[in-house]
Each structure stands twice: as structure tokens, then as C-alpha cells.
């Protein structure tokens, strides 16, 4: 709450208190404003037997006290919270501490501990990225020093660094949502406690709202009904907000910087009127119409990265067709799919764009059929496109995220979307480093570091050129794969394909199919230096499916030696 809002609220409390005192003494209150008179009239109708009243300003720490305390003639004590708002606005609950809210409100010290650990990791990454933006590559890890550098280079947020802020807050939101999802699925009573505290159920909450006219005053009691656990829903909105729907009312938890780029993070809480089905349908129709309007205004402008544009537009059209199939689904961010189309569709020629638009209509059936096989009965509650730059788990590279309700549990399903011109085209998955490919992130069977260092030394003295270095490294890597167990090979393939379900549209043929990443059938075979001296290939499912790993330098030859990457391309069987 801003200083001005706080002052207005405090003055309202003081005015109501003074008027109520006079009224209890049977004195006239005509000298007070209409707002004050209507408020005390409402209070006295609720509690006609008031003996006396005290204000929070009678205490030494008013901010930690209830606005008014009523002492009834029966001996009962009533705590009152007073709110004064313009008509159409919502009351603002007290903000919660980002590093304490899960323990304080949801009664989970363990969940708070996990969140705080992730918070520190993401905050350090954020500071490092902002400093790197200004200074280039660096090896500074001390948080205090990083904050000092951020404050000196960026005293305020600018367009230059907004992406790093948004990514950081997005990851906090995702971590919070995941923890609350687990908490919800455990049917934990912490949700009930959070509802009671945030919605002040043990107090009487009086909202006075006013319009432009002096006599336009409405006073009401804020007392939402306590929901059962089955009436509670989790949702997301924007890029930094988690929502909790308690029956008919919603509570939002929004992560934000207190002010400047190096300052602390706040958790702003707010009450949210959850959109009804008709409102959600209207929002979704508006999104679809905007996308259709763009399609009709298409003008082709040739660019070098056509395949990336096709992939991005495929993501947006998949989103579009989900809105069409599920017209009342909640959109986390209605603007994003429109922005995606607007950014990329001009890079695709008219014929290809029409094929892509038409063929993508088949993908919803492919995905929903796979979800039916997996969960039987489910409800899609929300839909979201995940920007590449925001992905926190490099093995979970989903483009589309669906939040599902399955047997009264909340399930998050990430889906990796691919668009191919032909059935036998290959899909690029990840670009892991040669140094880490055998480590725990992928195959978990050792390291290539000693081999890389040996080849690098020979490159440095001129014994090997770029091509020879890649051939030697690729062969050594292939031989290590050839000695791996089936379990290690399957693990590596799983991790290269990622955790997300894969949905593919073959837009040249107008079909789509969907696969779970766990579907690795039959023996995995290793083909060393196939199809070239700088590649190795793994095949499975009677060699109908494969991953090819091609070695390359991360920079062009003019830079000399640079880190070695592996381009991972897979070919999957197209099952309709």
C-alpha cells in the first residue's frame, strides 16, 4: 500500500472511531462525512449492543493491531478491519514476505526451506546475468559484490535488463506453483490456514466503497464462505503471479522487486474475482479473432531463419486450436500467442503458412488422445506458452504447458512442439556440451574432459586442425557409448529427448502425432561414426527411431579453439 493509500485508510479509521464514540454517547454525527456516517450505521446495525470501542491508535504499535475493537454489553469482543476503496477497486490484504509466506501462512517449514534454496539460486543467477550483460564473461559469485556492481551499472530497471528480471520472477512463480501443487495434492490443511489468515475470517471486515457523487456510498461485510479442499484451485496469471481460487474468491501472490534492480523481493498479495465461464469464453474468442486477423494480413518478408519462424508459429497455432477445442480454458497470458504470430509469421511464405495453419488443427486430437491414455479422465484448467529464455530445467524443454485436474489432483503437463515438412525429417532437440554429455545430466557414465584436454593440447601445438580434432573426439565419444550399458544408453536418450511429451505436426502431409519421451522400445544400438566421421548415432525400436550426435566447435574457426558442442537430432516414428 502506498503512503497516500495508507494515510487515507488511517484517516478513515480515525473518523469512524470518533463518530462511533459520539454515537455511543447519543451525540450527533451530522458533522461527519457521508462515508463515515454510513459506515458507523452499518456497524451499529451489525452490533446493536456496543458498550465501548477502542482504536488501533490507542496502542503503541498501531500497525500490528486491529483497526477497531468493539466491546459488546454481552462481554463479547469483536475485532474490526475497515477498508475504504473507490467503487470498482478491490481491497488490498497485507503483503507477505517472500522468504516466510509458506511457513507463516501455509504452515510448512519444509516447503519454505525448499523455496528459499531455489530463491537464492535464481537470485544469484539473475545478478550474474545482469553483470555479464554489462561486463561480459566474468567469474564473480559473491552476492554482495554482484549487488554492488548491479547498483553501480543499473540504478534503475531499463529495457536492457528487464528480460533478466522477468525471467527471475517467472522462475520464482514456477517454483511457488510447483510447491503449492505438491502441497495441494497431499490435501494439506495449510490451505485452510492460509485462507483463514488472508481472508481474515476471525475478524469482521467492513468495506466502504464510494463513487464520484458524495451520496454514492456502499457499505458491506467481506466474509467469503470457507471452501472445502475440492473447491480450491491453483492457477497462474501473467509471468510472476500464482493464484489460489478458494470457492468463489481468489487470492493472488505476485513476486515483484521492492524497487531497484539490486533491492529485495516482495510478495504482493491481492484479492481476485475469478473470471466466470462466460468471461473466459469471451477472452478466448478475442484472442482467436486477433490471431485470425493477423493471418488475413500476412505479407511475406524473406529471412534466413525460416525454420525457427515455422516452429514459433506452430506453437502459436497449437495454442489457438486448444482455445478452439476448449473455449472456457484459462489463459495464463492471452497476449503471448498473438505476439508470437506477429513476430514470426511474416518470415514464412504464404503457401507454407497455410499448410502449417491447416495441419496444426490435427495436433489437439493427437495430444488429448495421449492424455486420455495416460490419465483416462482429466480437465484442462489452464494453458500457457513457455518462452525459451524462461525455461528453468534444461531437460524439461516444453513449449506448451497445460495444467490438468486429475482425480482432484493438480498435474502439470509440459509438451514439446515440433513442426516438420516431411515424415522422415529430423528434429533438433538439445545442444549439450561434449564435456558434460557423459556426466549425470545425460548418460551418467563418466567424462570426456581428459580426452578433450589432450586433443586441445595437440590442436594448440598445430598437430591437429579443427576437422581432425572433431573426428578424434567424435570417435572417442562413440567408443565410450559403445561400451555403455543399455540402462545408460536409455537414460541418455531420455535426457536428450527431455521430460516433456513430444507432439509433432507434419505440415506437408496434414497429420500430427504425439509421443511420451519414455517410449524407447527394443534394444538401443550404437553406430560409431555414422553417418559421418564427426557423428555418432543411437537407434532403437528396430532402428525406426534414432538420435544422431554431431560434434562441432561453438565458435567459427577464426576464433581458434572453442568449446565443443554436440548437435542432437532425432528421428521418431510417426504414429498417428
From Swiss-Prot:
The keyword Hydrolase applies. Keywords: Endonuclease, Hydrolase, Magnesium, Nuclease, Restriction system. It comes from the Bacteria. Its EC number is 3.1.21.4. GO terms for molecular function: type II site-specific deoxyribonuclease activity. GO terms for biological process: DNA restriction-modification system. Its cofactor is Mg(2+). It catalyses: Endonucleolytic cleavage of DNA to give specific double-stranded fragments with terminal 5'-phosphates. A P subtype restriction enzyme that recognizes the double-stranded sequence 5'-GGCC-3' and cleaves after G-2. Monomer. This is Type II restriction enzyme BsuRI. It comes from Bacillus subtilis. The gene is hsdRR.
Amino acid at each position: 500500500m502506498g503512503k497516500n493509500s495508507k494515510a487515507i485508510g488511517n484517516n478513515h479509521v480515525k473518523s469512524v472511531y470518533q463518530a462511533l464514540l459520539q454515537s455511543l454517547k447519543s451525540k450527533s454525527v451530522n458533522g461527519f462525512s457521508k462515508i463515515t456516517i454510513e459506515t458507523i450505521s452499518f456497524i451499529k446495525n451489525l452490533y446493536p449492543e456496543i458498550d465501548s470501542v477502542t482504536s488501533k491508535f490507542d496502542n503503541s504499535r498501531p500497525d500490528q493491531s486491529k483497526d477497531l475493537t468493539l466491546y459488546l454489553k454481552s462481554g463479547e469482543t469483536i475485532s474490526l478491519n475497515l477498508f475504504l476503496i473507490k467503487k470498482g477497486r478491490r481491497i488490498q490484504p497485507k503483503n507477505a514476505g517472500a522468504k516466510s509466506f509458506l511457513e507463516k501462512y501455509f504452515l510448512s517449514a519444509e516447503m519454505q526451506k525448499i523455496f528459499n534454496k531455489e530463491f537464492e539460486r535464481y537470485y544469484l543467477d539473475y545478478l550474474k546475468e545482469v553483470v555479464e550483460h554489462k561486463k561480459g564473461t566474468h567469474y564473480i559469485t559473491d552476492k554482495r559484490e554482484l549487488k554492488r556492481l548491479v547498483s553501480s551499472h543499473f540504478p534503475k530497471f531499463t529495457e536492457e535488463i528487464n528480460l533478466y528480471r522477468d525471467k527471475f520472477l517467472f522462475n520464482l512463480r514456477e517454483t511457488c506453483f510447483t510447491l503449492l501443487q505438491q502441497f495441494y495434492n497431499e490435501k494439506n490443511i495449510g490451505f485452510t490456514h492460509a485462507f483463514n489468515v488472508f481472508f481474515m475470517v476471525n475478524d469482521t471486515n467492513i468495506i466502504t466503497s464510494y463513487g464520484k457523487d458524495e451520496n454514492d456510498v456502499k457499505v458491506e461485510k467481506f466474509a467469503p464462505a470457507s471452501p472445502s479442499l475440492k473447491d480450491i484451485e491453483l492457477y497462474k496469471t501473467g509471468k510472476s503471479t500464482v493464484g489460489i481460487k478458494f470457492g468463489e474468491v481468489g487470492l493472488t501472490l505476485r513476486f515483484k522487486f521492492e524497487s531497484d534492480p539490486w533491492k529485495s523481493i516482495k510478495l504482493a498479495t491481492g484479492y481476485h474475482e475469478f473470471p466466470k465461464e462466460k468471461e473466459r469464453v469471451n477472452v478466448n474468442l478475442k484472442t482467436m479473432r486477433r490471431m485470425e486477423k493477423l493471418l488475413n494480413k500476412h505479407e511475406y518478408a524473406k529471412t534466413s531463419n525460416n525454420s525457427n519462424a515455422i516452429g514459433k508459429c506452430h506453437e502459436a497455432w497449437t495454442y489457438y486450436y486448444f482455445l478452439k477445442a476448449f473455449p472456457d480454458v484459462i489463459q495464463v497470458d492471452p497476449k503471448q500467442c498473438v505476439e508470437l504470430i506477429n513476430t514470426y509469421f511474416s518470415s514464412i511464405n504464404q503457401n507454407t503458412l497455410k499448410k502449417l495453419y491447416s495441419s496444426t488443427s490435427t495436433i489437439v486430437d493427437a495430444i488429448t488422445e495421449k492424455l486420455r491414455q495416460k490419465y483416462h479422465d482429466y480437465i484442462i484448467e489452464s494453458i500457457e506458452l513457455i518462452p525459451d529464455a524462461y525455461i528453468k530445467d534444461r531437460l524439461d524443454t516444453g513449449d506448451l504447458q497445460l495444467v490438468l485436474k486429475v482425480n482432484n489432483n493438480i498435474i502439470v503437463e509440459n509438451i514439446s512442439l515440433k513442426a516438420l515438412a516431411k515424415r522422415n525429417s529430423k528434429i533438433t532437440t538439445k545442444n549439450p556440451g561434449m564435456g558434460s554429455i557423459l556426466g549425470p545430466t545425460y548418460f551418467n557414465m563418466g567424462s570426456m574432459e581428459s580426452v578433450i584436454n589432450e586433443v586441445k593440447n595437440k590442436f594448440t601445438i598445430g598437430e591437429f586442425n579443427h576437422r581432425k580434432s572433431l573426428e578424434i573426439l567424435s570417435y572417442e565419444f562413440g567408443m565410450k557409448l559403445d561400451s555403455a550399458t543399455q540402462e545408460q544408453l536409455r537414460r541418455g536418450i531420455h535426457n536428450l529427448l527431455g521430460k516433456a511429451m513430444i507432439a509433432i505436426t507434419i505440415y506437408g502431409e496434414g497429420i500430427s502425432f504425439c509421443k511420451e519421451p519414455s517410449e524407447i522400445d527394443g534394444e538401443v544400438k550404437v553406430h560409431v561414426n555414422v553417418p559421418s566421421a564427426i557423428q555418432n548415432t543411437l537407434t532403437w525400436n528396430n532402428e525406426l527411431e534414432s538420435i544422431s550426435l554431431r560434434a562441432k566447435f561453438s565458435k567459427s574457426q577464426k576464433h581458434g579453439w572453442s568449446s565443443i558442442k554436440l548437435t542432437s537430432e532425432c528421428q521418431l516414428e510417426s504414429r498417428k
